[in-house]
Amino acid sequence: MKTKILLLNFIIIFFLINVNLAIKKDSPFKEIQKNNNNKKENHDAINYYEDEDGFDVTIKDCISILVPYGKCTKIKSPFKKCPYKSIFISSNSTTPIIPNNNYNNNNNNKNKNNGSNQYIINLFENSKCYEKVNRNKNKIFKNFHEEKNYKESKKNELIINCKDKKLNKFNNNEIRVVCPISSKFDSSTSSISINTLAILSLLFLIFINKLIN
């Protein structure tokens, strides 16, 4: 009887650990790096943020899809409470969406982007989901934001208005949803750590052994 209970405990612990690892592997939330000591001057302007405390934050990973020419798309949000932070549209075309001179002047020639063929849309500035972006971005992308080439959906989907000439003039447009700052993640999506599982499992085993003895 004792052997069967111990074997059952082992199976339960093994199952919990594997479930936790699977959740972490499939999670859309990726770790971000803070680098306050070694600030980059030639960083990627799209994947670079400055958080509320003044730390430099580099986004490691984003959700990325390709939009075919002349077709609309819907992006489902991986975030339960906060639908979207921002997106940028990147074109494979040699014609830049952002003029080179405009981009470089606003960034004082520090953050040059080869081709400057990117456009960012900051979403929902008046909501809790809005994350302040790097200090130069609002100037660069202000006009595009005001044109409202997107709308919010009740189903947590971002609907791109593909009839807009800026989107349809390119053969392929890449739409990427920028991940939020880790501290702003929805706590309901976070998984239990392996250390916590190990401690709980150990306490459970001690409790079972006391019942047996």
Swiss-Prot record:
<feature type="signal peptide">
    <location>
        <begin position="1"/>
        <end position="22"/>
    </location>
</feature>
<protein>
    <recommendedName>
        <fullName>Putative transmembrane protein DDB_G0267860</fullName>
    </recommendedName>
</protein>
<feature type="topological domain" description="Cytoplasmic">
    <location>
        <position position="213"/>
    </location>
</feature>
<keyword id="KW-0812">Transmembrane</keyword>
<feature type="glycosylation site" description="N-linked (GlcNAc...) asparagine">
    <location>
        <position position="92"/>
    </location>
</feature>
<feature type="glycosylation site" description="N-linked (GlcNAc...) asparagine">
    <location>
        <position position="114"/>
    </location>
</feature>
<feature type="topological domain" description="Extracellular">
    <location>
        <begin position="23"/>
        <end position="191"/>
    </location>
</feature>
<feature type="transmembrane region" description="Helical">
    <location>
        <begin position="192"/>
        <end position="212"/>
    </location>
</feature>
<keyword id="KW-0472">Membrane</keyword>
<keyword id="KW-0732">Signal</keyword>
<dbReference type="GO" id="GO:0016020">
    <property type="term" value="C:membrane"/>
</dbReference>
<keyword id="KW-0325">Glycoprotein</keyword>
<keyword id="KW-1133">Transmembrane helix</keyword>
